[in-house]
């Protein structure tokens, strides 16, 4: 019984950490990465479609992304969607390829981005702790129903606390890597 709750908590904590990593990967550093454009949706036949489904995005050099749109008629819509995003990018069309140069980040912008990343990290830690609280509540309910002993409940809570510490450490490591990446240039 407690093992199932522990495994469920571990799975949910892992999802929290992955969601945090995905969130910070979208934050633009000075380096070109196709994941920067993951959040962009293009108006395609009346519905917002992710850019990745309509085009191939590759890194051309350290500061430029190249986008090859599958349907040429969509190029203007893709350009418009990139300009409308809050990424501050200005794409330029060159035949069949749309090039997106990434401007270098200013020191002030880097510091702002680090604040954003730290806020995301705190949200990640909070969501991991919420999973811990849910698991501990389930253990307390089992204890109240006399399905487990006090010793088993204490042991299970200690296991979940170790899991929590482990996953929070993963969030902190990802945060440190992203901060280093932001301050690199």
Swiss-Prot record:
Key word Flavoprotein present: no
Protein keywords: Cytoplasm, Protein biosynthesis
Subcellular locations according to the entry: Cytoplasm
UniProt keyword Ribonucleoprotein, yes or no: no
Pfam families per record: RRF (PF01765)
GO CC, alphabetical: cytosol
UniProt cross-references to Gene3D superfamilies, sorted A to Z: 3.30.1360.40, Ribosome-recycling factor
Biological processes per GO annotation: cytoplasmic translational termination
InterPro entries per record: Ribosome_recyc_fac (IPR002661), Ribosome_recyc_fac_dom (IPR023584), RRF_sf (IPR036191)
Primary site of residence: cytoplasm
Top-level taxon: Bacteria
Gene Ontology molecular function: ribosomal large subunit binding
HAMAP family per UniProt: RRF (MF_00040)
Family: Belongs to the RRF family.
Record-linked PANTHER family: MITOCHONDRIAL RIBOSOME RECYCLING FACTOR PSEUDO 1 (PTHR20982:SF3), RIBOSOME RECYCLING FACTOR (PTHR20982)
Annotated function: Responsible for the release of ribosomes from messenger RNA at the termination of protein biosynthesis. May increase the efficiency of translation by recycling ribosomes from one round of translation to another.
Protein known as: Ribosome-recycling factor
């Amino acid at each position: 019984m407690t093992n199932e709750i522990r495994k469920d908590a571990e799975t949910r904590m892992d999802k929290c950490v992955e969601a945090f990593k995905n969130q910070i990967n979208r934050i633009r550093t000075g380096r070109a990465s196709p994941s920067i454009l993951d959040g962009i949706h293009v108006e395609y036949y009346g519905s917002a479609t992710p850019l990745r489904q309509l085009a191939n995005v590759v890194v051309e050099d350290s500061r430029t992304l190249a986008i090859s749109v599958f349907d040429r008629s969509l190029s203007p819509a893709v350009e418009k969607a990139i300009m409308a995003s809050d990424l501050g990018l200005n794409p330029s069309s060159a035949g069949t390829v749309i090039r997106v140069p990434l401007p270098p980040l200013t020191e002030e912008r880097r510091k702002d981005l680090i604040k954003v990343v730290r806020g995301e990290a705190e949200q990640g830690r909070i969501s991991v702790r919420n999973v811990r609280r849910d698991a501990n509540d389930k253990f307390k309910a089992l204890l109240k129903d006399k399905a487990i002993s006090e010793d088993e409940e204490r042991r299970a809570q200690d296991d979940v606390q170790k899991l929590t510490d482990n996953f929070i450490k993963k969030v902190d490591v990802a945060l440190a890597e992203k901060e280093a990446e932001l301050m690199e240039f």
